[in-house]
Design a protein with these regions (language model features):
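Amphipathic alpha-helical "stem/stalk" segments
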Residues: 12-133
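Alpha-helical transmembrane segments of integral membrane proteins
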Residues: 2-9
């Protein structure tokens, strides 16, 4: 009888533990994106670079363009991690669409650079999001 009770109890505990672990992972990934955005908000010098970058401002010098590129790669790598974890994630969709909709510089960056640094499946995902706009 005790074995039967354990056999019934254990799977439900494992499901709960898996669900808690999945939620914790998702929360950690999304908080990483929020923290990364916080850099843009708290660093006035970078905010200027970011705002000019998303508008495709050609006056960005080499160092500024590099900083914008690194920010974009890092941001989209975090979205790719969310997508890798759950490719049906509403969070991945939300954060990708937020950035893709901010300005022509983001789309230029993605077409010229971004699509060449990410996994093929994620590139297809982002390409589909861009086509939907």
């Amino acid at each position: 009888m005790a074995i039967l009770a354990v056999a019934i109890f254990l799977p439900s505990q494992l499901r709960l533990q898996h669900r808690d672990s999945a939620e914790s992972t998702r929360t950690e990934l999304t908080s990483g994106i929020v923290q990364w955005i916080g850099i843009m908000i708290t660093d006035p010098g970078f905010t200027n670079i970011y705002l000019r970058g998303i508008e495709a401002d050609s006056s960005l010098d080499k160092e500024e363009q590099h900083r914008f590129n690194v920010f974009m790669v890092s941001y989209f790598l975090r979205i790719q991690q969310l997508w890798d974890y759950d490719n049906k994630s509403a969070d991945a969709l939300t954060y990708a669409n937020i950035m893709l909709g901010t300005g022509p510089g983001v789309l230029n960056w993605y077409r010229d650079m971004g699509r060449f640094v990410f996994k093929p499946g994620f590139v297809e995902y982002v390409d589909e999001l861009i086509e939907e706009e």
